[in-house]
């Protein structure tokens, strides 16, 4: 029997502890009931100063075991905690583990699949969960309120006999695809990524669909124009709604970003909020 040298276990020439050692871009497909998901994962542990390297295969094994053993369903956002726990059980010389998961998720909706992006970022030591953020993003549609009011005024000037009617209905404006992302601190493990999707849908509706029949297309456009929004409106409304309906502690962070692919400009419009549930709950709307 060959006695292989454990090189990783040797003492390094330069004794400096390393904060993050591990694997990046591990890819896994996952089927959840009628849905499909494609996961890209990073997993890191710390390595003490007196150890040359980490056992990289243990990181891959930690990911494989959790994914192959679990049926997550609604709780797919908990996958980071499970992987960190598994890693800490295998890396006996490490004190903390960090896991990052990007998920391309296709959710069955009738005969169609709606596309979501999900995000999990977890950091855990042997005593506590230090970080567990879950997030979701998808593509929607926004209509510009500024251009709408400008065209309303122009139409009324050109057609004074119908100005009263014009003031009561949505008018012409430019619209664009918009990507909105909501991320929430879930160390309390009280919410799921689908709770975040529900918050987004209250403000932005469901993700855009490749297949739209004539009436569906008309309703989508009409809905966006009945409720035109700047990217600033989008992030404010989603942040406020998240704090209102999600049962997370006051200290939980809530981050919202919104980016519109502007149809009349060669640039994008962007807005971002980074605050806490407690700060948002202090607001009194008028």
Swiss-Prot record:
Cofactor: Fe(2+)
GO BP: tetrahydromethanopterin biosynthetic process
Pfam families in the record: GCHY-1 (PF02649)
Keyword Metal-binding recorded: yes
Alphabetical UniProt keywords: Hydrolase, Iron, Metal-binding
Pathway connected to this protein: Cofactor biosynthesis; 5,6,7,8-tetrahydromethanopterin biosynthesis
Transmembrane domains' residue ranges: none
GO MF terms held by the record: GTP cyclohydrolase I activity; GTP cyclohydrolase IV activity; iron ion binding
Catalytic activity: GTP + H2O = 7,8-dihydroneopterin 2',3'-cyclic phosphate + formate + diphosphate + H(+)
PANTHER family: GTP CYCLOHYDROLASE MPTA
Protein name: GTP cyclohydrolase MptA
Gene name as annotated: mptA
């Amino acid at each position: 029997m060959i006695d292989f040298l454990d090189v990783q276990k040797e003492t390094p020439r330069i004794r400096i502890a390393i904060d993050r050692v591990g694997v990046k871009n591990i890819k896994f497909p996952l089927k959840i009931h009628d849905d499909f998901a494609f996961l890209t994962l990073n997993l890191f542990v710390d390595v003490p100063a007196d150890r040359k390297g980490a056992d990289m295969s243990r990181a891959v094994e930690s990911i494989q075991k959790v994914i192959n053993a679990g049926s997550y369903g609604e709780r797919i956002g908990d996958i980071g905690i499970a992987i960190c726990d598994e890693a800490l059980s295998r890396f006996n010389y490490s004190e903390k583990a960090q896991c990052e998961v990007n998920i391309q998720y296709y959710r069955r909706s009738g005969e169609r699949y709606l596309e979501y992006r999900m995000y999990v970022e977890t950091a855990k030591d042997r005593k506590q969960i230090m970080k567990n953020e879950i997030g979701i993003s998808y593509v929607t549609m926004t209509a510009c309120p500024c251009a709408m009011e400008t065209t309303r005024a122009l139409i009324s000037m050109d057609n004074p006999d119908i100005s009263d009617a014009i003031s009561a209905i949505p008018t012409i404006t430019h619209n664009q695809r918009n990507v909105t992302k909501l991320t929430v601190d879930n160390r309390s493990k009280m919410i799921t990524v689908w709770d975040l999707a529900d918050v987004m849908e209250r403000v932005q509706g469901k993700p855009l669909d490749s297949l739209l029949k004539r009436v569906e297309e008309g309703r989508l456009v009409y809905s966006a124009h009945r409720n035109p929004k700047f990217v600033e409106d989008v992030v404010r409304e989603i942040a406020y709604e998240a704090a209102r309906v999600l049962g997370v502690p006051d200290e939980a962070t809530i981050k919202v970003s919104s980016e519109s692919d502007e149809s009349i400009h060669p640039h994008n419009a962007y807005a971002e909020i980074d605050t806490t549930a407690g700060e948002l709950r202090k607001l009194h709307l008028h």
